[in-house]
């Protein structure tokens, strides 16, 4: 390894758990990483607008990889920001509406919700958290899909319709299910690992000099890709199995 490494941290379940603050020990550890000349990045499935200054960025990071590898910035400057193509949106949205799937479209600046299905949310805390975190940026899906600027879709699908949604989505998307019927739909070819790879190429960082820290199913690819993959003690079994170390 070179003298400078790049460390990529997942957010939910890694930096902090639902309803809890970021541990002071974690804040100190990230500060120490940077003091020693290394780079620290957020690497999350959340879209960029869902990575607020408080409580996340105030910790002190060099950059952000968001939306499962579709967005990245470094030292306040945009590196890349990809969006779902309109024809892809026009293909999947009718399926989500027909199956009464609660879905939100996550973009760099806005989170869009469907007024007809928002009431089908299985976990109200998730919707409440978005409203609290980004007031003014949580808006109804525009009637004209041309106005949508989204990178990924988060879904809560009725269990009996899950197979239908998965079958319809697999043409253009990869589906990451955190539970049987709660998950993320991300355009094919984009993962946290692809985001890290692209950041490394742009910044001249060797893959061997990367460290990834995560806990969930959408962290597996980056734990495998990084020079060193670290799974949290509370991680899912797939994450633990692929990691080099478990905390």
Predicted feature residues:
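Non-catalytic pre-domain segments flanking phosphatase-related domains
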Residues: 1-9, 28-31, 35, 205
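Conserved acidic, metal-coordinating active-site core of Asp-based
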Residues: 95, 99-213, 217-221, 234
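Active-site phosphate-binding/coordination module
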Residues: 19-121
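Short, structured coil segments at secondary-structure junctions
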Residues: 57-60, 67-68, 168-172, 225-226, ...
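Asp-based phosphoryl-transfer active-site loop
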Residues: 3-20, 223
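Short, well-ordered beta-strand core segments
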Residues: 7, 64, 102, 229-231, ...
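Asp-based, Mg2+/Mn2+-dependent phosphohydrolase catalytic module
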Residues: 206, 225, 230-247
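Residue-level signal for inorganic ion chemistry
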Residues: 33, 153, 223, 244
């Amino acid at each position: 390894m070179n003298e400078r490494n790049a460390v990529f941290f997942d957010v939910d379940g890694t930096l902090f758990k639902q309803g809890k603050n970021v541990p002071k020990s974690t804040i100190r550890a990230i500060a120490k990483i940077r003091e020693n000349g290394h780079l620290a990045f957020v690497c999350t499935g959340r879209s960029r607008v869902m990575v607020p200054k408080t409580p996340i960025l105030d910790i002190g990071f060099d950059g952000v990889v968001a939306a499962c590898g579709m967005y990245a910035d470094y030292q306040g400057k945009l590196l890349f920001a990809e969006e779902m193509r309109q024809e892809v949106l026009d293909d999947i949205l009718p399926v989500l509406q027909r199956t009464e799937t609660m879905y939100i479209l996550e973009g760099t600046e806005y989170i869009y919700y469907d007024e007809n299905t928002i009431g089908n949310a299985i976990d109200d805390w998730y919707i409440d958290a978005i409203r609290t975190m980004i007031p003014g940026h949580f808006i109804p899906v525009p009637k004209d899909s041309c106005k949508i600027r989204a990178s990924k879709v988060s879904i809560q699908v009725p269990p009996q319709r899950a197979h239908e949604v998965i079958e319809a989505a697999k043409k253009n998307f990869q589906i990451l299910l955190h539970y049987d019927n709660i998950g993320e739909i991300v355009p094919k070819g984009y993962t946290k690992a692809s985001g890290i790879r692209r950041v490394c190429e742009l910044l001249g960082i060797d893959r061997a000099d990367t460290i990834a820290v995560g806990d969930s199913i959408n962290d597996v690819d980056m734990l495998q890709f990084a020079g060193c993959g670290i799974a949290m003690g509370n991680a899912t079994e797939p994450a633990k199995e692929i990691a080099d170390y478990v905390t």
